Amino acid sequence: MTGRQRERRRRRAGAAVAAAGLLAGAGLGAAGCSGSDAVAGDSRGGDAVLTLRKAADRLVGAGSSKARTSMEMAAGGTRVTIRGAGVYDYRKRMGQLKVLLPQDPAGVAERRPITELLAPGALFMKNRGAGVPADKWVRVDTRTLSDGNLVTGGATDPFTAAEVLLGTRTATYLGRTKVAGTQVRHYRGTAHLGDAARRATAGNKGPLKAAAGGFATAEVPFDAYLDDEGRIRKIRHRFSFLNGREKSPVAVASTTLLYDFGASVRVRLPRTEDIYAGKIAEE
């Protein structure tokens, strides 16, 4: 192995530490471990499985939207929530979120929002901490993460969240309700990450395949709320993983709220010289 190859490997490992540290900072750290379709619906909900598998395409048709995210998990007997907000372009598969970690247990240090840039196969983070200068970005290859970055970054990429539904195996239409004042159809079901990976677009195949093998189970229960155009307005996934400290799987609930479709999205990826290449501290 050449010196340059060793340096690239060291940088990838350091970036993975930085990403994993988001969950560690909230009290958890993710680590990898190692049918037939059933359709339930009615004349109002239609073919639930087919409808849900088309939801990602409906977002591409919409072009873009604003997004709010939340990730809930139990840490040391206390439930904590990581929140985020931003915009996403479903055609370019790029977005930007401001992610806020919960306050530290002592309640003394105020946490600065972490800026995350989402791109195919990559996650960029600024204000990450862990010894990274405030004006530098950390780049993470999401294909190297055992969870496919479904939870490690503290927020699920909105388009990846939608493509999880490509793996829908069972689904039930539960009726109409409202999300943020919009009439929606509520579906509840289970998706398989392996199935989702096989049907996903090129940028999500690798991450979803990694998640299928990295979570405690590849089956993901969900609640999805679709508007009359078939676009996701709200989706809640329940992931399960082993974090290396707990004997039993840790449950993480990731919720994504989408609104203001057609919103302007401008994402500029960092220049090479703005990406941190030094050592990243473990938390």
Can you describe what each PLM-predicted range is?
Residues 2-10, 26-29, 33-283:
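Subset-of-secretome marker
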Residues 11-23:
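Sec-dependent N-terminal signal peptides
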